[in-house]
Amino acid sequence: LNLTIDGVTTAVDYVNNSYYLPIDMDAVQPAKVKVEFGGIGVDFIKIGDKKIKSGENIALSLNPGQNIEMEAGNNTIDKIRSCRLIVTGVPVIELSAPEGIEDENKRPCDIVLTDPKRRTNNSVLRFESYAGIEFRGAGALRYAKKSFSFKLKNRQTNENQDAKLLGLREDQSWILDAMWLDCSKMRNRVCFDLWNDFNTLYYSNTEPEAVNTTHGYPVEMILDGAYHGLYILSDRIDRKQLKLKKKGGYLYKGKEWTDECKLQGINTPYSNSKQAWQGFESDYPNEVGEIEFKYLSDLIQFFAAASKEEFAAQYEERLDVSSLIDYFIFINLLSAYDNTGRNVFWGIYNVNLTLLPKFIIQPWDLDGTLGRTWDAIKLRS
């Protein structure tokens, strides 16, 4: 059964015989909707006691969270198939990955994103694209519900292709966050949105389009014909988002609880021959020959070994103090203990502007906040 309601093609969960219909919660829903369908041997569908023919306008009240029981039938064969229409107030994304999905190796994928608000590429209701998809997050791979990252591509040339999904930035790379450990399904997104409102990049007058973290929206996800749950579709925090300079900009990501990530000292001298060093990853640049950990190493050494006099004389040159103060207040308000060494970005807007590189600090992975630890244990008040 292929089912369309008022021009919106429903997404099918074949495992549970369910049809997902996204509606715009901010719009007034019509009193009547046009029901269109097709399928082998399907002559009518039945909602309640009413038989409906394809193309018929019917009175149907649609509200988010509704589960409407339906039956699909044939006029000559006495056989009825039960199914459900599920109304959701968020967009629906459908992924089809016929070759499977792996870690750190993008596999072919087809994507369909249906947004009743038509925010994609400014007006598109149903966006379809070819893509490469992979699992995302090393620790999260052990969970049943996995996160994904995907890159939009041209099917014929396999070249990367930009799109403006859900009205977010125009880009090729996107994240689907599973929020597996967060029962509220909101911590990461709400905290990022708070940081967006909380903090202003010191160079924002020069770069008015710079954004200090991600933006995203909830979506219902169907993977290979089976409902997979609620996700957050978001853009990425990277050089492009922060508007760091291509020549002179640097972005480092703290991923472990090393002394280096905690700015407590250097146990192993840096090397630019790899993307990773002592729990840090060079997010930008990420090509050997362009990677430079010297600036980060100098910052760690400054924090760990500078005298009081040296620190007082140089800290305003080395750090965007406003950013650091905002970060200190932010992580304490949220009880973000998992963001005090790892899950932190350190960035440089342009190393060529000042005698000493000036660092900004940005949070990442904020699901261990607001009364929960990184592994979902409730904090004592």
Predicted regions, residues:
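Conserved structural position at the C-terminal beta-strand
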Residues: 70-72
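Internal "kinase-insert"/substrate-recognition segments embedded within catalytic cores
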Residues: 154-158, 164, 168-181, 212, ...
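Extracellular Ig-like/FN3 beta-sandwich strand-entry sites
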Residues: 63-67, 106
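Active-site acidic catalytic loop and adjacent metal/ATP-binding pocket
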Residues: 150, 317-373
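A conserved alpha-helical element in kinase catalytic cores
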Residues: 182-204
